[in-house]
């Protein structure tokens, strides 16, 4: 039964990822005053299926000098971790209601760094290695602020379980009392998922394609799926943390619809940002984090820690 539940979670995620690629190409197309994919199927609806068939029927080539075990393991690890992070997400009922669901998600996103590092190192190519080092430095840096912002929101909800956040936000979304945190969280998720304007890892002009430059066919498709699954997952987490939908226990499907709509809107904003903004320079990327976000998030975290202590001495107002 658990395996069936697991499948009913994984299959929709993979389907969503497949059609997100189509939505992205369509939106970017219309923003650049062109059509986007419109040949395969009605309005290009079968394009993701054609892409999948093309990628998985290609011969998975590998460089002669690569470390074969790591080279094959890296994309598998990337996709496995991307799908594992969906387990504690409440929609409104999670697959596993973990006491420390937030910590689990942080740990899984930290492990994703290994997939990037392995793929760059095992390819035995200087472009892949430089791309991987960039990706790892960026991911590790932005995880610092993500962790602090998560801690601040948890101080407001009072539990490490994600399901508690639904109850916390019955009366007010957490985006309202903590909008600076939300802004920084959203920008950090862009950087964490290597999306424009922070897509330094795949700087085509200097690194060809980044850490996955030597991958082709199936393994490349796995990296691609992992990247887009992470994007949807990060937006789903943003919805859970800051835009919590109201959950009526008798009609859980209303929560799911609400949750999906908000996640979709956030994902659209990712694509909108990609079409609108140019890429950051690498030093600007690091300055933004270490000199702007980190001091601000630390100050706000201290504020959320001290606030209940300061208020504790005030007698109840009737």
Swiss-Prot record:
Catalysis performed (reactions): a ubiquinone + NADH + 5 H(+)(in) = a ubiquinol + NAD(+) + 4 H(+)(out)
InterPro entries: NADH_UbQ_OxRdtase_su1/FPO (IPR001694), NADH_UbQ_OxRdtase_su1_CS (IPR018086)
Subcellular location: Mitochondrion inner membrane
Pfam families xref list: NADHdh
A GO molecular-function annotation: NADH dehydrogenase (ubiquinone) activity
Role played: Core subunit of the mitochondrial membrane respiratory chain NADH dehydrogenase (Complex I) that is believed to belong to the minimal assembly required for catalysis. Complex I functions in the transfer of electrons from NADH to the respiratory chain. The immediate electron acceptor for the enzyme is believed to be ubiquinone.
Record protein name field: NADH-ubiquinone oxidoreductase chain 1
Organism of this sequence: Hsunycteris thomasi
